[in-house]
Amino acid sequence: MQSSRPSDRQLAIVVSVAVGIVVAVITTATFWWVYDLTLGRAQREAAQTAGARWSPSDGIKVITSSPPVTPTDGRQNWMGTQAWNEGVQAGQAWIQQYPNTVNVQVLIGMSSAQIWTYMQQYVSGALGVGCQYCHNINNFASDEYPQKIAARNMLRLVRDVNAEFIVNLPNWQGNYVQCATCHNNAPNNLEGFGAQFINSVPPIKVTVDPLDANGMAILDPAQKPEAIREPVLLKDAILFYIYNYQVWKPFDPNDPESGRGSLALTYDGGRTQDQVTINQNVMNYQAWSLGVGCTFCHNSRNFVAYELNPAGDNVLNPLYAYNKLKAQRMLLLTTWLAENWPRYGAIAKPEIPTGSGAASRYSYQRLGDGQIYNVPGCYTCHQGNNIPLASINQANIPSGDAGIVVLPPQIRGR
């Protein structure tokens, strides 16, 4: 009778496999333990920081932890703890001397103390600069620096963007833009496009055939805007649509073919392959900017549709149609910004900045007055979040006097 006892060779194999499994488990556990000690916690903390809502303390920390600067245009240093303290002390002295406002043109109706609190926390903090960046702190009413004129006009910009584009969004969720929404603790050279756009869009040339006001393709180069009469790099074609978007058939819930704009792939013979490529990459840029996929705005079985109340269970995101309408409104916003940027006090640049502290070249546009400006794009505010982390929701604005210094009613747009 044959023995059922395993042979020595079989036992050796079993023991070897068991030891191997134990060693593999211990090695893997040790690796992840060491990884967590060295990198894991830091990465988790970085992720939490990246996903945290903006706070005025973020910008104030940038100011107080930075080295001083040496202005050459007559302004005083605005960075560092000393500059911050000097600005705070000067502001406190000013509101004691002038409890009623002097030379206030936008935040009319607020007291000097209210304006001072708002400016210190939500303007200085938003831009990551001390009071001296815009003000002669010996005379806060003075308009001697162009940065103050620009800031005043930017308050008008916040008001008008909220009024014209934000509070009347389809399915508005109560979010407003504020200074920090664009600035995120930096006064200028704001990045409008981001690493994914810069690194992922291929360096190929395409022919842009824009649509006219009737939704018909313009094929004659002589009839096109000068910037796109010849083939251009795909990145520049994307920029053209970000800053030159129109709606030629406004949305009507009773018309399934409405809600069509510059990026529509028309049914009359279709568009060229170049136009499809441009369209796809504009969508990619928006998706990268918001940190979302196609179904955030689209029904994947019918990309053209707007179904405000979709039936059935085959729609991943039942609010997608509202998001699609919002995205169209945001393209109208970036177009409006490019058209109106100079009149809101933006300071032109003699040339596109390069080197340390500059944004990518795509963040600078030569506008209608022939000058170069740092113009916002989708990424400027969103930075990978479908709701910008530096926006502010009405639920977070206290009622009554306390809310006035968080987001003044004068710039909420309603």
From Swiss-Prot:
Heme 4 binds at residues 378, 381-382. It comes from Chloroflexus aurantiacus (strain ATCC 29366 / DSM 635 / J-10-fl). The keyword Heme applies. This is Cytochrome c-554. Its main location: periplasm. Heme 2 binds at residues 154, 179, 182-183. One of its GO terms (cellular component) is periplasmic space. Keywords: Electron transport, Heme, Iron, Metal-binding, Periplasm, Photosynthesis, Signal, Transport. Binds 4 heme groups per subunit. The N-terminus is blocked. Residues 1-24 form the signal peptide. InterPro entries: Cyt554Puf2C, Multihaem_cyt_PRC_cyt_su-like, Multihaem_cyt_sf, Photosyn_RC_cyt_c-su. Serves as the immediate electron donor to the oxidized BChl2 (bacteriochlorophyll dimer) that is oxidized in the first step of light-induced charge separation. Can also oxidize low-potential substrates.
